[in-house]
Regions:
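Feature for soluble, non-membrane regions of globular proteins
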Residues: 4, 143-144, 411
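Active-site pocket scaffolds in enzymes
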Residues: 117-119, 125-130, 134, 265-276, ...
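N-terminal secretory signal peptides and thylakoid transit peptides that target proteins
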Residues: 1-17
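Histidine-centered copper-binding motifs that mark active-site loops
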Residues: 11-16, 26-285, 292, 298, ...
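Short, surface-exposed ligand- or partner-binding patches at beta-edge/loop junctions that are enriched
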Residues: 156-161, 298-309, 461-472
Length: 486
């Protein structure tokens, strides 16, 4: 059966049981939730194909990125989907701290778009990670992202962020991995697994969203890994692999497990563990990423999502079950591989609790009764503090150079993942309980009728950006607000 929000909160308090929660990640040993997959939609069984990799050279990564609609095959069906450079997902970008990323984005869609480098701590100004840029159909825009020399390594990704079209474009296929390298781990191989979902009509068109799905956040009936349905992976016993897993779903929560194999967590988002932490499950809200080590044991296994109850709006919006299913299969056969070398300890992340707090704020997710003309399409209007997003309004003004404490509350009956652009958060309290470890995130799940407390370091990157719910139908409907740092 799927885990409930209440169980997740209770587990978050049980550090002695090896639970990894910290607002977004969850693992637990020996629980009766490892139910077999019940999903059967579509074809599968192809070998996993990883996206093409492009790397920076001499400190620069230059990319020509074309957003367009193309015909491809998904789950054995010809489909007309959205692509970056003709593929789903787009290329995997690999860079180093201190690098510059230059992207020429050409919009060949029939709606406006733009680009967000989710997870990068870079300038939000001008042609940087600026969510207020709008690139009309037929237009070209040149982006430049300058990574600081001390940018943390980790798993990031890129996707559109033009308000009002984000959910449709991500659901349609516009996303790709962005890896900031810098921490070396002895492994047999590394894999990038971009998990997404989509719904297709019988003739291969993307299913348009309905009003109840805006309320809950749509979940596709096909869950894909690197654009494939239930691909196959293979390895030898004794090998150790590094898996970079991205939840690129519009609204779906992923409760990942790989029964029969040995999993260790290196980090979530750009946060990192000092030493690998053994886990049985990892919970990724939409937008979260996991950096995992998989030590291979002989036999067949399934990479599964075990199901998560994210709440709902009752009769108005239905339930919010992110259901269980098989994402991929793994066959571990052949001769035993030589034992890999030890994983080196990693540098400690600075603890923001050691700095003085320059300001405190409380921010609330809200869903108010709407009208037929409102963003919620006659049901509920999502927002923050009772207001829907307005690009001409500044909701929070912050002085550059300080650390602030933000209390994020969620009085609604469903979970909301909170994402702050540019400035990473350190989770210090969830469910009224302190978080002991230094836990850095850029997406923090706020449970229904719950709250979390975070510290945000505004030491650099002045400019204007946003925070929002990463259930992207909610974001498009108004659950976003602006913050100006200066």
């Amino acid at each position: 059966m799927p885990i409930t929000r209440r169980q997740a909160l209770q587990l978050g308090m049980l550090g002695g049981l090896g639970v990894v929660v910290g607002g977004v990640g969850l693992s637990q040993t020996g629980l009766p939730w490892l139910a077999p997959s019940t999903s059967s939609a579509g074809a599968g069984g192809e070998s996993l194909v990883e996206p093409e990799v492009v790397r920076s050279r001499d400190g620069v990564l230059r990319v020509e990125l074309v957003a367009t609609r193309r015909e491809t095959t998904i789950a054995g069906q010809r489909a007309r989907v959205l692509t970056y450079n003709g593929t789903v997902p787009g290329q995997t970008w690999r860079v180093q701290p201190g690098d510059r990323i230059e992207v020429r984005l050409r919009n060949e869609l029939d709606t406006p778009t733009n680009l967000h480098t989710h997870g990068l701590a870079v300038s939000p100004r001008d042609n940087g990670d600026n969510p207020f840029v709008s690139i009309d159909p037929g237009q070209v825009f040149d982006y430049r992202f300058d990574l600081p020399e001390d940018h943390p390594p980790g798993v990031s990704w890129y996707h559109p962020h033009r308000h009002g079209t984000v959910a449709d474009q991500l659901f349609g296929g516009l996303y790709g991995a962005l890896i900031v390298e810098g921490d070396r781990v002895p492994v047999s191989r590394e894999r990038v697994l971009v998990v997404s979902d989509i719904s297709l009509t019988g003739d291969g068109q993307i299913v348009p969203v309905a009003a109840p799905e805006v309320m809950m956040g749509r979940e596709g009936n096909l869950v894909l890994v690197n654009g494939q349905h239930r691909p196959q992976l293979s390895a030898r016993p004794g090998q150790r692999e590094r898996w970079r897993v991205i939840n690129a779903c519009t609204s779906r929560y992923l409760r990942l497990a790989l029964p029969g194999q040995h999993l260790e967590l290196l980090g979530i988002d750009t946060g990192r563990e000092l030493t690998p932490r053994e886990v049985q499950e990892v919970l990724l809200a939409p937008g979260n990423r996991a950096d995992l080590l998989v030590s291979m044991r002989a036999g067949s296994s399934e990479l599964r999502t075990l199901g998560y109850d994210r709440g709902g709006m009752g009769m108005m919006g239905g339930g919010g079950l992110s259901g269980p299913g098989t994402l991929a299969t793994l066959a571990v056969t052949g001769a035993e591989a030589a034992a890999p070398g030890p994983v080196p300890d990693r540098l400690a992340v600075p603890d923001l609790r050691e700095k003085s707090v320059a300001g405190r704020r409380e921010i609330a997710f809200t869903m108010t009764m709407g009208s037929m003309m409102g963003p919620g399409r006659g049901m509920m209007d999502p927002g923050f503090d009772g207001r829907a997003f307005d690009a001409d309004r500044i909701d929070q003004r912050v002085s550059v150079g300080g650390v602030e404490e933000w209390l994020i509350t969620n009085p609604t009956p469903m979970d909301h993942p909170f994402h702050l652009h540019v400035w990473p958060m350190q989770l210090v309290e969830t469910g009224g309980q302190p978080v002991r470890e230094v836990t850095r995130r850029d997406v923090v799940n706020v449970p229904a009728r719950g709250r979390v407390r975070v510290l945000v370091d505004f030491a650099r990157h002045p400019g204007r950006s946003v925070y929002h719910c990463h259930i992207l139908d909610h974001e498009d409907a108004g659950m976003m607000a602006s913050v100006e740092v200066g």
